[in-house]
Amino acid sequence: MNVEKILRTVPREKAFYFFTSIGNYTGISASSIGEFMEKINEVNIKSLEFHFHRGDFEKWMAEVLEDKELAEEVRKLQKFNLSGDALRNRLHEIVSKRVRHLTSQPSSTEPKFSVF
């Protein structure tokens, strides 16, 4: 695990763009895990539900941020079939715990992360 790589700001073309449905961009994007954490509380709940049920969050986390552990924790939420504020709150909790965990670790270590 490369902490600096996970916490970095990615180029604009690799940012996460929030949509409420295909073709309906919200005007909100996130270029880092920290920015993504902030946007969870700002974006329309319909956007969170849209991306969550498609698996878009974990795909971006695994492929762009290269944080497979966080992607797996978000994927585990699928079994709870969350929506509305319950989804927003749980997603924010998982991402914020991950950010705190990453920012408190020396970059040379590879501690295990799990919220379950």
Q: Positions of the model-derived regions?
A:
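Terminal, compositionally biased segments used for targeting/anchoring and flexible tails
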Residues: 1-116
